[in-house]
Amino acid sequence: MSNYQFTKPAGPFRLSELAKISGATLYEGKGETFTVSGLAKLSEATSNDLVMLHQKKYVKELKNTAARSCIIGPDYVKFAPDSMYLLVHPNPYKAFALIAQAFYPSEKSSSFIAPSAKIESTALIGSDCSIAHGAYVGNHARIGKRCKIGVNTYIGDGVTIGDNCIIEDNVSIRHAVIGSNVVVYPGARIGQDGFGFASDAEGHYKIPHAGGVIIGNDVEIGANTCIDRGSLGNTVIEDWCRLDNLVQIGHNVKIGKGSIIVAQVGIAGSTELGEHVTLAGQVGVIGHLKIGKGATVLTCSKVLRNVQPGDRVIGYPAISISDWQKQIRFLKTAIKSKNPLKS
């Protein structure tokens, strides 16, 4: 059962309501009026919790769970107990996400400005905004409607933030234009100087960064992620992108719509990602490369050359998965042979 110490769920909901919310189908029409009070893991659920099965390795837990209702894919219906009510969806994880949003809706912003917040006289603040203690909003900054600005957050001069944004605690934003429905988690740094120097035998000469950061709509920026501003042009994060915690985005990087950047990724300056690119955890990308639309770079890989649209690459240097698998098989064979230096 979920721990409600910090977040209490909405509801309860009837399964018929959850089917409508998620686009799922009630298996054989059973359980329309069954009431669900929360979401839980298979191993921790009570009878009134809703669980999910989206991987075969959890089938045993499904058979032993106390839950009486489950979000499930069509291929796994045969594994469910006969007495269980099933919400069937071709993408159970998506259905779970939509249902979870119903149980845990985003907090509505209330109109409140803390006495210790500092808002410059030329800043424009939209209606129904919440600005917490110690926050600062600079000259000519613009914040849209229904935004939440967290404790000790810094919004620099001229920054623009759209409607319905959540900027959490201890964030700093400079030289940036941010769209609507954006979430920035605690400790993120947006729009600071990029890492650019001209070097010779006498030292390193700082290159001023006169550009900015452009962030689209419906973007999430993880905790302690850093996005450097451009040197002359802008660093751009397009709509629907998701950046995990501890990500480093260098100056003038462009990240295409719907891309996913997982924790501890580093992208060096002026690299461009197409739409719907995925960079898995701890991927490193050198500067001035292009990663094509729909490409995937697997965990811990290091990208040293362009990646074509739709390619899936892995390794150091990153190569196609098929080539990487061939290399691994060859190495295993060579290690087992009496003379590993001979092919």
Swiss-Prot record:
Q: What are the recorded Gene Ontology BP terms? A: lipid A biosynthetic process
State which Enzyme Commission number(s) the record gives.
Answer: 2.3.1.191
Gene3D superfamilies under this entry? Hexapeptide repeat proteins, MurE/MurF, N-terminal domain
Gene Ontology molecular function terms on file: N-acyltransferase activity
Q: Which EC class, in a word? A: transferase
Catalysis performed (reactions):
a UDP-3-O-[(3R)-3-hydroxyacyl]-alpha-D-glucosamine + a (3R)-hydroxyacyl-[ACP] = a UDP-2-N,3-O-bis[(3R)-3-hydroxyacyl]-alpha-D-glucosamine + holo-[ACP] + H(+)
Question: Mind listing the UniProt keywords for this protein, alphabetically?
Answer: Acyltransferase, Lipid A biosynthesis, Lipid biosynthesis, Lipid metabolism, Repeat, Transferase
Its annotated pathway reads: Bacterial outer membrane biogenesis; LPS lipid A biosynthesis
Q: What binding partners and quaternary form does the record give?
A: Homotrimer.
Q: Which HAMAP family does the UniProt record give?
A: LpxD (MF_00523)
For this chain, the family text in UniProt reads: Belongs to the transferase hexapeptide repeat family. LpxD subfamily.
User: What is the protein name for this chain?
Assistant: UDP-3-O-acylglucosamine N-acyltransferase 2
Q: Which organism is it from?
A: Legionella pneumophila (strain Paris)
> What is the primary gene name for this protein?
lpxD2
